[in-house]
């Protein structure tokens, strides 16, 4: 029986217990809450994007979805928690504090905007945006107000979502955008990280060095500078045991790459073919690039539009890519997307979140159910908790995620090669057998033997007499991961 099936069984037994309790059998609200907990198992993974004001969250949402669906201007919509879900047709719904739901008019002025003139934002809980994007089929993305916003209410909305007072998790994972490693960000990350270690809240946290092209002042090598910054962030956050990775991303370049227009490609190709001295002079600064008296072969108005869409870094990168031999808009878009860092971020999200989505959702459901039966006690409450706690404590996929988070910040008796191998075997590079064993996916015949060898190796390493308790725990986690693969291969025979 899978973990999700076990959660459903516990939930079914819990519902029966409440139906048998005189105080609750007529409480429709109680059964609605239990139904919602169960429904989470069938829903897409919930991933929240968080960070300080102007960190680039909405732009990154747009880049991940591949469309301008999250308002990026300083409107009321950016001060409200917004849920982006898959739907057959575009629709925006406002959820009011009293339970009322209202449709919100959608406008298009360069990008999506929500008309909230007839709605008091202070009365809203959140907004729900349904959009027919393939990227939203398997993941619901939650855009949050800046945590250091001058509007206290906006910041509090985000805190209520990420660090709920009732301990019931609203999301399954968090992508946290960082421009600097300031005290406010570290404090919030520690709170979320504390929830991870305490077996409640989101089990997965990924950091993003956002607006990465601005770290290097828009220079052609800006992403290299951003990569160095991301490594420093990773090192410092790892030492605190807060998150496993920080990825540098230029959300603006990623969004532009995913929505590149043929007219923009033609204009960039003209610029790339301009006289080299004049072009280099124009690319020195924003003012030079948009000067009306510039001899560049592209109208100043179009250059201003390119600047808004690409930024100076994106324009410089596009011209360099075209000069290197790319000949069509598809090739340019692919190169820009790769260089934006979005591909690397999506790979990390896939490894840490998507490949473990069932386990993350099961964890959220278990924590929510445990909190619910404590808040609404019935005679069966101790028995429900007795069923839940072993799953939260012992389910191996949860332990893998915790170990991946804890390993960088804890001292062990393992050497660097052993730590790298252990991270890989517990799923740090992906959850497929090939990824865990470091094998070519095409060479599947070696996998059963490699899994058995890994189980034997880590069993011996777990029994080493000089191990400290944490090292032994880590090695035992590797043993269980390897043994699970051995069992899976045996079942296929």
Curated annotation (Swiss-Prot):
Pfam families: Dynamin_N. InterPro entries: Dynamin_N, P-loop_NTPase, TRAFAC_Dynamin-like_GTPase. SUPFAM superfamilies: P-loop containing nucleoside triphosphate hydrolases (SSF52540). It comes from the Bacteria. GO terms for cellular component: cytosol; plasma membrane. Induction: Specifically induced by a broad range of inhibitors of cell wall biosynthesis, including antibiotics that inhibit the synthesis of peptidoglycan (ampicillin), arabinogalactam (ethambutol), mycolic acids (isoniazid, ethionamide) and fatty acids (5-chloropyrazinamide). Down-regulated by the nucleoid-associated protein Lsr2. Transmembrane segments: none annotated. This is Isoniazid-induced protein IniC. It comes from Mycobacterium tuberculosis (strain ATCC 25618 / H37Rv).
